[in-house]
Amino acid sequence: MKFEAVVRTELGKGASRRLRHAGKFPAVVYGGEEAAVAIVLNHDDIVNQMDKPEFYEGIVLVIDGAEVKVKPQDVQRHAFKPKVEHMDFIRI
């Protein structure tokens, strides 16, 4: 599976809320030798694939043109809506 991601320029609660209202959500990629990167993902693209087992075995994120193989590490979900609030990915 391959998903497009964009590096986040704005950080904080207000910026994250604006992303969620726009149908996106914040995430972070960390691990390995490289520094952690804050990214933005399209909510519907990710949520539609999260019920498949291969999603949790490893996916490819295209972050500003560079492909990074990652695995979901943590998912924060909304309390009662079927929405993802934030995700952590670890490089593999």
Swiss-Prot record:
Keyword vocabulary terms for this entry: Ribonucleoprotein, Ribosomal protein, RNA-binding, rRNA-binding
Keyword rRNA-binding (UniProt): yes
One GO-annotated biological process of the protein: translation
InterPro entries in UniProt: Rbsml_bL25/Gln-tRNA_synth_N, Ribosomal_bL25/Gln-tRNA_synth, Ribosomal_bL25_short, Ribosomal_L25_dom, Ribosomal_uL5_bac-type
Coiled coil: none
GO CC list: cytosolic large ribosomal subunit
Presence of the UniProt keyword Ribosomal protein in the record: yes
Any GO molecular function: structural constituent of ribosome
Family annotation (CDD domains): Ribosomal_L25_TL5_CTC
Disulfide bonds: none
NCBIfam families hit by this protein: PRK05943.1 (NF004612)
Subunit composition and interactions: Part of the 50S ribosomal subunit; part of the 5S rRNA/L5/L18/L25 subcomplex. Contacts the 5S rRNA. Binds to the 5S rRNA independently of L5 and L18.
Family under the similarity heading: Belongs to the bacterial ribosomal protein bL25 family.
Function: This is one of the proteins that binds to the 5S RNA in the ribosome where it forms part of the central protuberance.
Designated name of the protein: Large ribosomal subunit protein bL25
Gene: rplY
